């Protein structure tokens, strides 16, 4: 394990939230010899065992931050659709999940569209966090630290107060504490609508299916490749994880009713609820649903779409990942853009550290003032570089789900209209996948 050394004149960063983005940002800062400590409210890393996928551009961001991040991704069984553009399997595919087009071949599903997937790689969230944590030095992560308030001390330090009564200091704070971000609430106040996420009127039922069972329903080729099954008011997505030993399955349903409890985004659900909602769908879709456990978690999908954040930073406090731009998962890119955030921030804060170590420090008061100005400027630059792209993702994710759930899929006369949506989906997807990482880094230097 690499040993990192820091001096007291260099900035010390506090990261709140030990999810994927918080841990990757911690590794990126450590790689740049930026002093950092990560605070996580749980007793340990808490990510669920659901699947997560990263684009080629997101993995390039990981590589630029620290090659150990990519190594961790590979060790936890990340599997690729393909990194070869010419590979016939390197596609995301949309197929008709509702209509039966051939009575003679009841398992046949009409292909609707395919888009070059640009090298998506998927794995389990919990396994990735476990592997990433192996690269973080002892003492860098503090568990059981639920943030209460943030104050600025007389010495310009940021004081983090935790609900257990303890406090810690830092020169700057980055909130990576997810969709329910306490740091976001601190920045905007409890009365600002952007402080809290909003219900998108979509729910998701997630589960992992053994690959051998999935092959019995889907066939070998379809089971080992990414597919969306679309239809009226719902869609089912699946892709392989864990070195192709399991199939990650997610069923998304439209829900016109209000979510009953705004304090929690998950409730108990059942497979029978999904089967009822998908009554009349293609038998292949129903066959995959039948492989899910009887008891399921029902996840309400919230985002920042109704009230986007007007800015991502204020003073020496900044937001990144879902804390800044929580999105519904229909592009499968929320974590990818969070990784882009992490590269941008680690680059900017490395520049702050370099400037401070090269400058004539002068008096302590001058040094503290200079550090504060540099940190605030770094966070303002992050806001300028990242906000437009990430807020676009929030809106675009809602849009593509609406296209997946068109009622026209169930109408033979109107179905051809629904099928025209894929040109729009292609354009939106390419904007995410073919990201100019070098251009982003150049913006941090201007």
From Swiss-Prot:
The EC category is: oxidoreductase
Among SUPFAM superfamilies, the record links this protein to:
FAD-linked reductases, C-terminal domain, FAD/NAD(P)-binding domain
Which positions bind FAD?
40, 53, 125, 322, 335
Which applications in biotech or industry are described for the protein in this UniProt record? Eupenifeldin is a bistropolone-humulene meroterpenoid first discovered as an antitumor and anti-leukemia agent. This metabolite also shows anthelmintic activity against the parasitic worm Hemonchus contortus, anti-malarial activity as well as antifungal activity.
- E.C. number(s) listed in UniProt: 1.-.-.-
Q: Does the keyword Glycosyltransferase apply?
A: no
What cofactor does this protein call for?
FAD
Q: How does it sit in the membrane?
A: Single-pass membrane protein
In what pathway does it function?
A: Secondary metabolite biosynthesis; terpenoid biosynthesis
Coiled-coil intervals, chain numbering: none
Q: Which UniProt keywords apply?
A: FAD, Flavoprotein, Glycoprotein, Membrane, Monooxygenase, Oxidoreductase, Transmembrane, Transmembrane helix
Query: What stretches pass through the bilayer?
Result: 10-30
Q: Which GO terms describe its biological process?
A: secondary metabolite biosynthetic process; terpenoid biosynthetic process
Gene3D superfamilies with a match to the protein in the record: FAD/NAD(P)-binding domain
Disruption-associated phenotype = Abolishes the production of eupenifeldin.
Q: What is the top-level taxon of the source organism? A: Eukaryota
**What GO molecular function terms would the record report?**
FAD binding; monooxygenase activity
Q: Which residues are glycosylated?
A: 33, 243, 395
> Where's the active site on this chain?
206, 239
Keyword field contains Kinase = no
Q: Where in the cell is it found?
A: Membrane
Q: Name one GO cellular component term.
A: membrane
What is this protein's function? FAD-dependent monooxygenase; part of the gene cluster that mediates the biosynthesis of eupenifeldin, a bistropolone meroterpenoid that acts as an antitumor agent. The first step of eupenifeldin biosynthesis is the biosynthesis of 3-methylorcinaldehyde performed by the non-reducing polyketide synthase eupA. Oxidative dearomatization of 3-methylorcinaldehyde likely catalyzed by the FAD-dependent monooxygenase eupB is followed by oxidative ring expansion by the 2-oxoglutarate-dependent dioxygenase eupC to provide the first tropolone metabolite, tropolone stipitaldehyde.
Q: Tell me the protein family, please.
A: Belongs to the paxM FAD-dependent monooxygenase family.
What is this protein identified as?
Answer: FAD-dependent monooxygenase eupB
State the organism's lineage.
Answer: Eukaryota, Fungi, Dikarya, Ascomycota, Pezizomycotina
């Amino acid at each position: 394990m690499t040993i990192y050394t820091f001096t007291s004149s260099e900035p010390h960063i506090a990261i709140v939230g030990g999810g994927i983005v918080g841990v990757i940002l911690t590794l990126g800062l450590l790689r740049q010899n930026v002093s950092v400590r990560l605070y996580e409210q749980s007793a340990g890393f808490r990510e669920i065992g659901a699947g997560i996928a990263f684009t080629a551009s997101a993995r390039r961001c990981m590589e630029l931050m620290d090659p150990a991040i990519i190594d961790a991704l590979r060790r936890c069984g990340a599997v690729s659709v393909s990194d070869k553009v010419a590979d016939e399997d390197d596609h995301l595919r949309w197929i008709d999940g509702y209509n039966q087009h051939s009575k003679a071949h009841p398992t046949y599903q009409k292909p609707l569209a395919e888009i070059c997937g640009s090298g998506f790689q998927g794995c389990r969230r919990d396994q990735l966090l476990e592997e990433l944590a192996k690269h973080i030095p002892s003492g860098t992560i503090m568990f059981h630290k639920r943030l209460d308030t943030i104050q600025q001390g007389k010495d310009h330090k940021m004081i983090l107060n935790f609900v257990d009564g303890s406090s810690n200091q830092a020169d700057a704070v980055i909130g990576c504490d997810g969709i329910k971000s306490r740091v976001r609430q601190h920045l905007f106040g409890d009365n600002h609508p952007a402080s809290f996420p909003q219900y998108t009127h979509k729910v998701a039922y997630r589960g992992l299916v053994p690959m051998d069972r999935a092959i019995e329903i889907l066939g070998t080729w379809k089971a080992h490749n990414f597919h969306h099954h679309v239809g009226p008011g719902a869609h089912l997505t699946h892709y392989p994880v864990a070195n192709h030993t399991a199939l990650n399955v997610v069923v998304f349903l439209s829900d016109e009713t209000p979510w009953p409890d705004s304090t929690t985004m998950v409730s108990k659900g059942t497979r029978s609820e999904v089967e009822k909602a998908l009554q009349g769908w293609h038998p292949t879709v129903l066959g995959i649903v039948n492989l899910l456990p009887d008891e399921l978690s029902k996840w309400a999908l919230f985002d920042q779409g109704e009230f986007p954040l007007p800015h991502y930073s204020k003073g020496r406090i900044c937001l990144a990942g879902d804390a800044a731009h929580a999105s519904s998962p229909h592009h499968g890119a929320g974590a990818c853009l969070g990784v882009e955030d992490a590269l941008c921030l680690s680059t900017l804060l490395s520049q702050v550290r370099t400037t401070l170590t090269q400058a004539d420090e002068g008096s302590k008061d001058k040094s503290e003032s200079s550090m504060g100005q540099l940190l605030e400027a770094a966070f303002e630059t992050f806001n300028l570089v990242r906000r437009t792209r990430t807020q676009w993702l929030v809106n675009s994710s809602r849009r593509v789900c609406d296209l997946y759930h068109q009622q026209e899929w169930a109408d033979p006369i109107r179905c051809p209209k629904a099928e025209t949506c894929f040109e729009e989906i292609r354009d939106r997807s390419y904007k995410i996948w073919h990201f100019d990482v070098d251009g982003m880094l150049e913006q941090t230097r201007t």
